[in-house]
Structures are given as structure tokens and as C-alpha cells.
UniProtKB/Swiss-Prot annotation:
One of its GO terms (biological process) is tRNA methylation. The gene is mnmE. Its main location: cytoplasm. Residues 212-478 form the TrmE-type G domain. Binds 1 potassium ion per subunit. GO terms for molecular function: GTP binding; GTPase activity; metal ion binding. It comes from Neorickettsia sennetsu (strain ATCC VR-367 / Miyayama) (Ehrlichia sennetsu). GTP binds at residues 222-227, 241-247, 266-269. Keywords: Cytoplasm, GTP-binding, Hydrolase, Magnesium, Metal-binding, Nucleotide-binding, Potassium, tRNA processing. The keyword Signal does not apply. It is found in: Cytoplasm. This is tRNA modification GTPase MnmE. It is an enzyme of class 3 (hydrolase).
Length: 550
């Protein structure tokens, strides 16, 4: 085995840097660097001066770990210097003349090969290094403590016990073995299958804790998706404008939600569009939502909610308040209109609807003190015809008049249909949907309406309702955390699935040798998780994710 070396700390300016040398010739590093340390005692710290001829390069500390009582199971020397770039380069150049630079994870790989740890403990090390939240650290600590290995070894021991009975049948065919033994073997195999099936039915919580729970924000354009995204990210990652369709692609940020890792995604607003790029963004948004662990569905509190309204005066009041808020927010930049056919559909009257729209000229004139706008409003005698001529300057409110709650199957347009399809898919896939209404500070009188419909009301501007939203997301993702989960990687899951498949193939009607082979293969798959059976391709995959020097 060759002797390897690596800088175990970050290359750059720092207070302390640590070099690690492991292998049969590790002690030769002291001579190579000209350090005046003779026959060092294991686990003692030695002070030495590093010279280049007569020039003092640095003052260092040296620790020697003798085989096999070291991290790698080999002789190991650790050299602690100051984190000067010049010093690090000098030491690296010296060590490279005699030793081989370590590959990523090579120190830990040698520890596994020398039986200093199993694969799950090695994975625990890299997970601790990569952990960003408390739950990730707790899960990684279970690996490092050996508890995960205990679970897999216990499962393998049960399979080996069954295999030993079958081997007895094979090795001693002339002996009289009670027929009840085969029945007991069958019962044991069924019990093991139940254990593995239970482990597999964990909702992939272990992988999600390690990689992050996916939380996707969806909604129409300009409902506040990017504003909420930036608020939770605590920095401006998404561009926020009042121009619909600003967000085209998916933006992601990692968050710590009360100890749980969350990957929050901002998506394109769902609307009807002729823009090819925006269409692609909408398609991606809907696809991302169906792959999420939690969907956060946003609506604007200023949306009209005329569903089930049958009184003309109530509907008129709702629309007036809505337009008044919209005009105040938009100023003279936009022209606001109502699509009469949807008012008719909900209210059942056309006479008062058009009259109400004409009366709104006064509301708009009061809020827009600009001569050109005032003149325009006073001539809104044919508001519906003008909508077609000024389509590019209109705020179309008709698509706001129908509720798009997940439990509502009615569709008034293509946008409604796409939302309903999304919520139907989410229900089938058991993806929780958190309903949120934004801009609660604009219309506080309408909060109760939305709260009664199960919405969380927030105001990013005032920071209101944000903790309630985070608590709701936390409740959902934390409820999936099963303390007994033992799968944290895809390779663990694959090993258990393969083992379960071989156990299911076991059949006492088969020749006993073939039946025993299925059990043996099942045991081997379980053993591959901890590394009892070391496969080169498995080792390569695991340690390639390690940093150099670990």
C-alpha cells in the first residue's frame, strides 16, 4: 500500500492548517521536512521548526498515530502549520517528492478497507461534514455512532439464521429433520419480509432529511411568489416587478425550517400566454410542483370572490372595493375593467352589471388625478368594446372571479383547468397543499373571508403571518419523520429492495439448493450496506463525494 498525503483543511489564509500523511512510510515525512523529531511516541504532540536550508519557514506541531490505532488503521502523521499560502505550497511540494497525493475520500476508504469502520459510519462522516441543519446532524450522528449498522446487522443476522437451517438440510440430507422446521423457516422469512417492507415504506424521509424537503411556490403572476421567496431567503434572489411573467425559470434556495432542510422553489406564474419561453417556464413550474413534498399555493387578497353572491348590492360593494384598491396601487399606468360575462354568470343579472361598471368611472377619476385619465374615464360609455381595443392596457379581472381552491373542480378558463389538474395530481400523490393569500395589509377587512376558506393570510410588507406559514410547513415535513428510519441513501433502498425480491422468490417447492441461494443473495444485499461485502463500484461511488484530505 502506498503512502498518501493531503491538506485536510481549506487551502488559503487561516490560523491553522493540517496535513495528513498515511501509510507505511508516514514517519519518513519528518525526515523529508527536516524536522528534529526522533522516534516520536504515538499520540504525543511535538513542537518543531521547519527550515529551508537556513531560512525558518514555520513553527509546526506534529502528532504520530501508530497502526492500527489510527483513523485509517495505518501509520499516520499529522502536521499542523500556520495557514499561510506560501507555507502550504512549500510543504506540499516537499511531500509530493516522496508520497502520492490522496484522492477524494481516500483516507476514509482505507479506514473501511482496514475494518476501522463500516460504510454507514463512513457515510455518517461525510453527512456530518455536509450537515446544515439540526435534523441532518442528528441523522448523521446515528450513522457515526453505529446505530444504523446495528439495524442492518440485526436484519442480516435474522437472514443468516434462516440460511443456517437451510444449509443443515443440504449438508445433512440423511438426517431426520422435523417437517415443522421448514414451516418455521417460511414463517421467519415472512417476518423478515414484513420488516423490510416497513423500512421501505418510510416516505423516503431519510433521503429527504439528507438532501432537503422540496417546497414549491405556485400561483398566478403578480400574486407575490417572488416577494415571498426573497423574504424567506433573506436576500434578493428573484427579480420582483409588477410586470406579469417576470419569473421564467425555477429559482431555488436552501432554508433551515426549524431544523429541517428545505429547498424552496420560486416558479413562473401560471397564466395563458403566447410567449414560447414563458410557456416553457409554466410547464416546468407545474412539473416541479408534482415532484414537491409541499406545494404553497398563493393568491392575491384583492382577487374578487363573487362565488355564491346573489345580492346585487353585495356584489357591487365587493367589486368597488376591489377596483378602488387596484386603481390606488396601479395609478395612471393601467386601465382597469371587469369582464361582464363572468359577472353575469355569477350574479345572474346583466342590467345592473353594466351600470355598475359605468359608475366605477367616478371611483377611478377620484383616484387618478390626471387630466388624460379623467377624460378617458368620463367617456367609458362603451367599456366592453373598449376592452377589445385596449386589450394590452387592461387588467383582466374575470379570471379572478372563480375560486381555485384545491377542492373546487369548476373551471372558467384554461388557467383554472391547469390549477385543478395540479391539485388533482397532488391529491393522488399525497402532496400537501398549503393555501396562502398574500398582501393582507392592503385589505385587512377581507382576512376573515380567506381564513374561513382555510387560507393562511400573510403580508410580506409587514412580516405578518410568516411565522404561521413556516410553522405549517414544519408541521407537514416533521410529521413524516419516522424515528426508526434506516434508509438515508438510494443505495440503501436499492439493497433492501433487492433483498426483499430474493426473499419473495424463496419457495419450499424449489430444490433446497436453489431456495437457499435466494436467501444467501438476500443476505449479501443487506451486507453490502455496511460493507461486509465490499464492492469496488460501491466504494467508488461513496468516496467520490468526500473532500480531499478526509
Amino acid at each position: 500500500m502506498s503512502t498518501i498525503y493531503a491538506l485536510s483543511t481549506v487551502f488559503g489564509k487561516s490560523g491553522v492548517a493540517v496535513f495528513r500523511i498515511s501509510g507505511p512510510d508516514a514517519l519518513r515525512a519528518l525526515e523529508l521536512l527536516g524536522l528534529d523529531i526522533k522516534q516520536p511516541r504515538p499520540r504525543f504532540v511535538y513542537f518543531a521548526r521547519l527550515f529551508d536550508e537556513q531560512l525558518l519557514i514555520d513553527e509546526v506541531l506534529v502528532v504520530y498515530f501508530a497502526s492500527p490505532a489510527s483513523f485509517t488503521g495505518e501509520d499516520v502523521v499529522e502536521l499542523h502549520s500556520h495557514g499561510s499560502i506560501a507555507v502550504l505550497r512549500y510543504i506540499s511540494e516537499k511531500l509530493s517528492t516522496l508520497f502520492k497525493p490522496a484522492e477524494p475520500g481516500e483516507f476514509t476508504r482505507r479506514a473501511v478497507l482496514n475494518n476501522r469502520m463500516d460504510l454507514t459510519k463512513a457515510e455518517g462522516i461525510i453527512d456530518i461534514i455536509n450537515s446544515e441543519t439540526q435534523e441532518q446532524l442528528k441523522q448523521a450522528s446515528r450513522h457515526l455512532s453505529g446505530k444504523l449498522a446495528e439495524e442492518y446487522n440485526s436484519l442480516r443476522d435474522k437472514i443468516i439464521k434462516v440460511l443456517s437451517y437451510l444449509e443443515a438440510y443440504i449438508d445433512f440430507p440423511d438426517e431426520e429433520i422435523p417437517e415443522t422446521v421448514l414451516a418455521e423457516i417460511q414463517q421467519s422469512i415472512v417476518a423478515i419480509q414484513c420488516d423490510i417492507s416497513r423500512y421501505l415504506a418510510d416516505g423516503k424521509v431519510g433521503e429527504k432529511i439528507r438532501e432537503g424537503f422540496s417546497v414549491v411556490i405556485v400561483g398566478k403572476p403578480n400574486v407575490g411568489k417572488s416577494t415571498l421567496f426573497n423574504y424567506l431567503a433573506k436576500r434578493d434572489l428573484a427579480i420582483v416587478t409588477d410586470i406579469p411573467g417576470t419569473t421564467r425559470d425555477i429559482l431555488e434556495v436552501r432554508l433551515d425550517c426549524h431544523g429541517y432542510p428545505v429547498i424552496l422553489s420560486d416558479t413562473a406564474g401560471i397564466q395563458e400566454t403566447c410567449d414560447a419561453i414563458e410557456k416553457m417556464g409554466i410547464t416546468r413550474a407545474l412539473k416541479k410542483a408534482t415532484e414537491a413534498d409541499v406545494i404553497v399555493f398563493l393568491r392575491d387578497i384583492t382577487e374578487l370572490h363573487l362565488t355564491n353572491v346573489r345580492r346585487e348590492d353585495v356584489a357591487n360593494s365587493v367589486i368597488e372595493r376591489h377596483l378602488d384598491r387596484q386603481v390606488a396601487a396601479l395609478g395612471s399606468r393601467e386601465h382597469i375593467q371587469i369582464d361582464q360575462r363572468h359577472v353575469d354568470k355569477l350574479i345572474g343579472s346583466s342590467d345592473w352589471a353594466q351600470e355598475m361598471q359605468l359608475n366605477e368611472a367616478g371611483v377611478r377619476s377620484k383616484n387618478m388625478n390626471y387630466p388624460d385619465i379623467e377624460e378617458r374615464d368620463l367617456n367609458l360609455r362603451d367599456i366592453l368594446d373598449e376592452r377589445h381595443e385596449e386589450k394590452d392596457r387592461s387588467v383582466m379581472c374575470h379570471d379572478m372571479m372563480q375560486e381555485h381552491d384545491p377542492d373546487n373542480g369548476e373551471c372558467s378558463d384554461d388557467v383554472d383547468r391547469r390549477f385543478n389538474e395540479l391539485f388533482t395530481a397532488a391529491k393522488k400523490l399525497e402532496i400537501p397543499v398549503v393555501k396562502v393569500v398574500t398582501k393582507g395589509d392592503i385589505a385587512p377587512t377581507q382576512l376573515s373571508f380567506w381564513q374561513d376558506k382555510g387560507y393562511i393570510c400573510i403580508s410580506v410588507y409587514k412580516g405578518e403571518g410568516m411565522q404561521l406559514l413556516l410553522d405549517k410547513i414544519f408541521d407537514i415535513i416533521s410529521s413524516s419523520n419516522i424515528e426508526a428510519h434506516i434508509i438515508t441513501r438510494a443505495r440503501h433502498r436499492l439493497a433492501l429492495e433487492n433483498a426483499l425480491e430474493h426473499l419473495r422468490r424463496f419457495n419450499t417447492d424449489l430444490p433446497i439448493e436453489l431456495a437457499a441461494e435466494e436467501i444467501k443473495l438476500a443476505a449479501n444485499h443487506i451486507a453490502s450496506v455496511t460493507g461486509e461485502i465490499k464492492l469496488d463500484d460501491v466504494l467508488d461511488e461513496i468516496f467520490s463525494s468526500f473532500c480531499i484530505g478526509k
